[in-house]
Amino acid sequence: MNNMNIQISSHFVKELRSKTGAGMMDCKKALQAADGDMVVAAETLRKKGLVSADKKSTRLALEGVIDSYIHTGSRIGVLIELNCETDFVARRIEFQQLARDLAMQIAACQNIFYVSINNIPQNIIDREIRIESAKEDIFNKSPEMKDQIVKGRVGTRLKEMSLMNQPFIKDQNISIEDLVKQHIALLGENIKVRRFQRFLLGETLDMI
């Protein structure tokens, strides 16, 4: 049986969140994986470095680094601004390695254009909806089914554009969002990907 299909009461999710400070979805996933065992779920969150990470995510992050990555052959380059709360953490090797890993991720995944889905402009979302709605394979579907298919496909496309939704290239079992949360818990400060820019040799300006 797939543990992720287990129904977990919102009461237990809120209780685990209260005890650990982890995000609601992280708590729900941990409880599902632990078959509802609160102690096991809390330990899972602790091992993943997610305990208290959510509590730190609202604090201002104004320090940090601007890092760069140039891929082999010098045909792809990335600049990224990664923020934290203090210069002390900005100098930590773990923080600097995170910046480098994120830059490598952006270089490797050329469909990424935004930090998160929340950063995607509405005109881009509307364009994706129009593209999916015009596809021939859904012409004969009922309006309800068509809307459902379009919503699913657009959701998938938006995740492909978002850095935070990508599986980490060094560990496909975690997302970039999870990776950042782990470093928030490890370093004890809020961490934010502020912005990034990818450069492709010979690229046009109108990428998307």
Swiss-Prot record:
<comment type="similarity">
    <text>Belongs to the EF-Ts family.</text>
</comment>
<keyword id="KW-0150">Chloroplast</keyword>
<dbReference type="GO" id="GO:0005739">
    <property type="term" value="C:mitochondrion"/>
</dbReference>
<dbReference type="Pfam" id="PF00889">
    <property type="entry name" value="EF_TS"/>
</dbReference>
<dbReference type="InterPro" id="IPR001816">
    <property type="entry name" value="Transl_elong_EFTs/EF1B"/>
</dbReference>
<dbReference type="InterPro" id="IPR018101">
    <property type="entry name" value="Transl_elong_Ts_CS"/>
</dbReference>
<dbReference type="InterPro" id="IPR009060">
    <property type="entry name" value="UBA-like_sf"/>
</dbReference>
<dbReference type="GO" id="GO:0009507">
    <property type="term" value="C:chloroplast"/>
</dbReference>
<dbReference type="GO" id="GO:0003746">
    <property type="term" value="F:translation elongation factor activity"/>
</dbReference>
<dbReference type="InterPro" id="IPR014039">
    <property type="entry name" value="Transl_elong_EFTs/EF1B_dimer"/>
</dbReference>
<dbReference type="GO" id="GO:0070125">
    <property type="term" value="P:mitochondrial translational elongation"/>
</dbReference>
<dbReference type="InterPro" id="IPR036402">
    <property type="entry name" value="EF-Ts_dimer_sf"/>
</dbReference>
<keyword id="KW-0934">Plastid</keyword>
<protein>
    <recommendedName>
        <fullName>Elongation factor Ts, chloroplastic</fullName>
    </recommendedName>
</protein>
<comment type="function">
    <text>Associates with the EF-Tu.GDP complex and induces the exchange of GDP to GTP. It remains bound to the aminoacyl-tRNA.EF-Tu.GTP complex up to the GTP hydrolysis stage on the ribosome.</text>
</comment>
<keyword id="KW-0648">Protein biosynthesis</keyword>
<keyword id="KW-0251">Elongation factor</keyword>
